């Protein structure tokens, strides 16, 4: 016998305003982070090209003649100290806060210190002055990342400086051979798209934290 009960021809419509699942929020958060990073790099590249065009951004190698040294002894000029290696260009730090100072104005993205340390140097840091400033401070301090053999790179991010102070060691009594300080060293263009250590941490964890807070906000909103 034929069943005459009414049948459902169409499925029930999906509930309007259905919240996104946590996985979807997480994907959206990371996609937004990638877009923000690309915009940041492209804007920074445009600013860099503008400074190159007007001549305020140049690549320059500073030698010992361009720099001032504080709390250093030059082995070449001191008969009481003997360099660990029989070659010129070696300095000895006389306390735990030696300084290499450059006085000048430039627009800088990165600074590279090429130096050989005969002993472990501890931390290597750079301080910078902005226009109108005369005193170095901890708020304008950049720690070095080791970018090659006897090579330390400081990422300033693109700003105008009127002076630099490099602290090549933090322990004192370290023989150091200074091979040069390079302002805005030439780098492959694609490296601009590669985040540094701190930026990697931000890109990895900030979207996850943002997605978690978004999930909590959605739950609270739909419970009301």
Could you tell me what each predicted segment is?
Residues 1-22, 223-224:
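N-terminal Lys/Arg-rich, disordered targeting/topogenic segments
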Residues 13-105, 180-200:
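Glycan-recognition and processing domains
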Residues 117-122, 159, 171-172:
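Short proline/glycine-enriched turn/loop motifs at strand-loop junctions of beta-rich domains
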Residues 208-224:
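Juxtamembrane interface at the cytosolic side of transmembrane helices
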Residues 73-153:
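Extracellular ligand-binding interfaces
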Residues 152-160:
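Short, hydrophobic beta-strand segments
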């Amino acid at each position: 016998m034929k069943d005459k009960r009414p049948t459902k021809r169409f499925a029930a419509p999906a509930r309007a305003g259905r919240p996104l699942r946590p996985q979807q929020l997480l994907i959206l958060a990371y996609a937004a982070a990638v877009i923000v990073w690309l915009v940041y790099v492209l804007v920074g590249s445009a600013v860099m090209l503008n400074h190159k065009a007007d001549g305020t951004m140049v690549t320059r190698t500073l030698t010992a003649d361009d720099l001032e040294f504080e709390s250093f002894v030059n082995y070449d000029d001191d008969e009481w100290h003997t360099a660990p290696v029989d070659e010129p260009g070696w300095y000895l730090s006389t306390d735990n806060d030696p300084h290499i100072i450059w006085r000048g104005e430039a627009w800088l993205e990165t600074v590279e210190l090429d130096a050989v340390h005969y002993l472990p140097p501890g931390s290597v840091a750079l301080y910078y002055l902005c226009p109108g400033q005369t005193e170095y401070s901890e708020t304008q301090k950049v720690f070095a990342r080791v970018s090659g053999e006897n090579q330390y790179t400081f990422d300033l991010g693109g700003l105008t400086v009127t002076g630099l102070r490099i602290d090549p060691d933090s322990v004192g009594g370290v023989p150091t051979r200074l091979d040069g300080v390079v302002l805005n060293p030439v780098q492959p263009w694609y490296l601009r798209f590669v985040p540094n250590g701190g930026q990697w941490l931000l890109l990895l964890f900030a979207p996850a934290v943002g997605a978690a807070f978004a999930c909590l906000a959605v739950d609270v909103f739909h419970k009301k």
